[in-house]
């Protein structure tokens, strides 16, 4: 059985400890005369929600995931009073499925005599993104990454080995337990609580409050019981995780219910919407996507420190054949060898997509594995894996044109026999012809979208900027919400850079807010 890591996989992981809301009494911003600024709002008072409760804090962090927790701890360490508003009942967000973080020049690396060329790494990442990402932010992140790891260690975060994971350099710092559930979330949550950070769980941030000058000075949020809370603050830090759940917003990029499955729950786009509503500039046309390919309704399971599945791993097998809803081949099937995140992209150009295999291929792949056999049976029962006695019947089962599928098979097998994929250039060692007679299979695959990366335009301080590239005072977007270092796809050349960016952006935004807003 092949093991597959899921960097953005979210589940109800038992190792993540829920923490109750910290009492709000006694928490207030520094009394330096600036509090009067928080009473004004730029919104129409007749339309503004009527709060049942009003709170006062220096900094409000929306979202208690990887970047949100980093922001909370940094803010408390900097002497600010902090409230964290989290829609779920526990802290952690997507951090529970993150296996480790990128860094250069951490003390852990120094102790192991690991050295890496920063310039070469930065150039490779810029080239892979076709220079559509922010070189300045990327450079800042790389140069600060080692100190960020050291800072996390000082907060109780536990790391294990350092290797290259799937990238080019030995820069991936594995969490001690293999995921962030116990090694990151638990110690950072405990540190935040110990430093006096207030948490409002089961509370959804809905709307930002601006003063007459356009600065963000607070927000409205709604608790699970419908109670409306107004939080007056000097800075709002959005750590809301993007909008991977919002297929209505993703439709313009080709993602539909037929070809895509959002895999990270809670990414409802509320942070994006709130920022746009107060003049923030959208970066959706240039944002990156973190995801991959999955077999729907056959979820991965956690085993031995990895998220595992048999059928879900098929998209990473290069010797199969991919076809669209018409039965046409549309890509070189070894694309995952460069980056398994890339596999999501060609699928969004299709209405539907399927992996085709003959009986010998399926038997070789499953290899008698009990879990694999169960998934094969379950998939057929759910109508996502199709089995037929011939290709014509299989075409009918998946709704493809039998004549087109026949032409596809003839062309593909011809390329296999020639040892040259003249259609899409798949490496010859992966060109395995499909039997034209006997039992055959089709496995439906969809894009598995874990995160949108960088839907809001931000500057080097992670201030959200307006359409004139001017920062909106008091408003920040961190983590994947405000990421400017990926375009189109999460490249993974710098393994763990998403998690590292979460830490760096959360800390950087807070330090700028403390310097300029408090």
Model-derived features: where do they sit?
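Beta1/beta-strand and adjacent pyrophosphate-binding region of the FAD-binding site
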Residues: 53-65
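Conserved beta-strand-loop-beta-strand element in the redox core of flavoprotein oxidoreductases
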Residues: 209-230
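Glycine-rich loop(s) and the adjacent beta-strand/alpha-helix scaffold that form part
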Residues: 235-298, 493-495, 499-508
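A glycine-rich dinucleotide-binding beta-alpha-beta segment and adjacent secondary-structure elements
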Residues: 404-489
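N-terminal secretory signal peptides and thylakoid transit peptides that target proteins
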Residues: 1-17
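Core beta-strand elements of the Rossmann-like FAD/NAD(P) dinucleotide-binding domain
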Residues: 55-57, 226-235
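Conserved N-terminal/central alpha/beta ligand/cofactor-binding core
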Residues: 46-48, 81, 87-198, 202-204, ...
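An anion/pyrophosphate-binding glycine-rich loop and adjacent beta-alpha core
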Residues: 272-400
């Amino acid at each position: 059985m092949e093991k597959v890591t899921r960097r953005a996989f979210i589940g109800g992981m038992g190792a993540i400890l829920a923490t109750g809301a910290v009492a709000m009494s006694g928490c207030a911003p520094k009394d330096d005369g600036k509090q009067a600024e928080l009473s004004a709002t730029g919104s129409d008072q007749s339309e503004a929600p009527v709060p049942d409760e009003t709170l006062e804090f220096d900094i409000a962090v929306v979202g208690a995931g990887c970047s949100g927790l980093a922001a909370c701890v940094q803010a408390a360490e900097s002497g600010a009073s902090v409230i964290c508003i989290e829609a779920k009942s526990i802290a952690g967000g997507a951090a529970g499925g993150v296996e480790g973080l990128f860094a250069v020049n951490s003390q852990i690396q120094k102790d192991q005599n690991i050295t890496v060329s920063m310039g070469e790494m930065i150039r490779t990442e810029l080239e892979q993104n076709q220079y559509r990402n922010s070189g300045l932010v990327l450079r800042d992140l790389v140069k600060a990454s080692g100190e960020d790891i050291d800072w996390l260690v000082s907060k109780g975060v536990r790391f294990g080995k350092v290797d290259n994971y799937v990238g080019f350099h030995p820069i991936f710092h594995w969490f001690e337990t293999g995921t962030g559930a116990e090694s990151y979330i638990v110690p950072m949550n405990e540190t935040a609580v110990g430093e006096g950070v207030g948490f409002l769980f089961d509370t959804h941030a809905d709307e930002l409050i601006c003063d007459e000058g356009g600065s963000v000075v607070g927000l409205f949020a709604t608790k699970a019981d419908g109670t409306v809370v107004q939080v007056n603050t000097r800075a709002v830090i959005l750590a809301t995780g993007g909008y991977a759940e919002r297929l209505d917003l993703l439709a313009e990029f080709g993602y539909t219910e037929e070809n895509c499955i959002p895999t990270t729950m809670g990414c409802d786009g509320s942070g994006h919407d709130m920022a746009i509503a107060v003049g923030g500039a959208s970066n959706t046309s240039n944002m990156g996507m973190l995801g991959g390919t999955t077999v729907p309704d056959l979820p991965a399971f956690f085993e031995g420190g990895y998220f595992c599945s048999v059928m879900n791993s098929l998209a990473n097998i290069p010797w199969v054949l991919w076809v669209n809803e018409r039965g046409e081949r549309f890509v070189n099937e070894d694309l995952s060898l460069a980056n398994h995140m890339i596999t999501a992209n060609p699928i969004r150009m299709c209405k539907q997509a399927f992996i085709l295999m003959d009986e010998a291929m399926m038997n070789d792949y499953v290899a008698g594995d009990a879990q694999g056999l169960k998934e094969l049976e379950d998939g057929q029962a759910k109508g996502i894996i199709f089995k037929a006695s011939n290709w014509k019947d299989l075409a009918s089962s998946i709704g493809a044109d039998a004549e087109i599928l026949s032409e596809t098979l003839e062309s593909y097998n011809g390329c296999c026999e020639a040892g040259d994929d003249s259609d899409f250039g798949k490496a010859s060692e992966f060109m395995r012809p499909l039997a034209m007679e006997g039992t055959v299979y089709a496995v439906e695959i969809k894009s598995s979208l874990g995160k949108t990366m960088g839907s809001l335009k931000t500057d080097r301080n992670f201030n959200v900027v307006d359409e004139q590239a001017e920062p909106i005072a008091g408003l920040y977007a961190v983590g994947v919400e405000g990421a400017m270092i990926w375009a189109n796809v999460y490249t993974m050349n710098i393994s763990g850079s998403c998690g590292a960016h979460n830490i760096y952006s959360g800390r950087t935004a807070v330090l700028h807010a403390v310097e300029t807003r408090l």
